[in-house]
């Protein structure tokens, strides 16, 4: 996904959960492939660390938002066709796909379907349950014929579930 798509998605999720901001503008996005098989174990550790190190007194400050933004950035890319090994296109095709995804994401986030996803996603109670869900939904995703529209639905569902679950786990950890 392109940076603007990540920002639109983050804004929609954060607005729906009344959180501040989610940032992910790190240079590692250029050097670290955003592919499930390569980075998911690291993202799983980042989720665990985020929850374990959450400081109730600081809340969702800029640093916390940036950390959650990194997690969500990778999750979104796991459900973006060009970031998966079976993508047949080249870099140019990848850029066109993400351009279409950017415009599609912007439009989708204004729909009733997007609002319904926000309302109905599950909030998991443990990192193990959450990462099991992510593995399962990614496995299902990999079996599909991919379209921009289908990617957007998976991205919004997965990312909203992750944020809702992480915030749920943090609330248990601190309160």
Regions found by a protein language model. Give the residues of each.
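N-terminal leader/auxiliary helical segments
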Residues: 1-70, 75-175
């Amino acid at each position: 996904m392109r940076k603007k798509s990540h920002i639109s998605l983050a804004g929609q999720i954060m607005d729906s959960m009344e959180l501040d901001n989610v940032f992910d503008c790190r240079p590692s996005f250029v050097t670290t492939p955003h592919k499930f098989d390569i980075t998911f174990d690291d993202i799983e550790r980042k989720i665990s660390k985020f929850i374990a190190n959450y400081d109730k007194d600081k809340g969702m400050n800029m640093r916390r938002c940036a950390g959650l933004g990194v997690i969500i950035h990778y999750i979104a890319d796991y459900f973006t066709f060009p970031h998966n090994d079976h993508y047949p296109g080249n870099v140019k095709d990848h850029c066109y796909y993400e351009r279409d995804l950017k415009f599609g994401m912007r439009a989708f986030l204004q729909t009733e379907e997007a609002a319904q996803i926000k309302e109905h996603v599950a909030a998991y109670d443990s990192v193990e349950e959450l990462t099991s869900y992510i593995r399962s939904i990614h496995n299902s995703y990999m079996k599909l014929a991919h379209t921009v529209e289908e990617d957007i639905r998976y991205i919004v569902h997965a990312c909203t579930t992750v944020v809702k679950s992480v915030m749920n786990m943090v609330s248990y950890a601190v309160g």
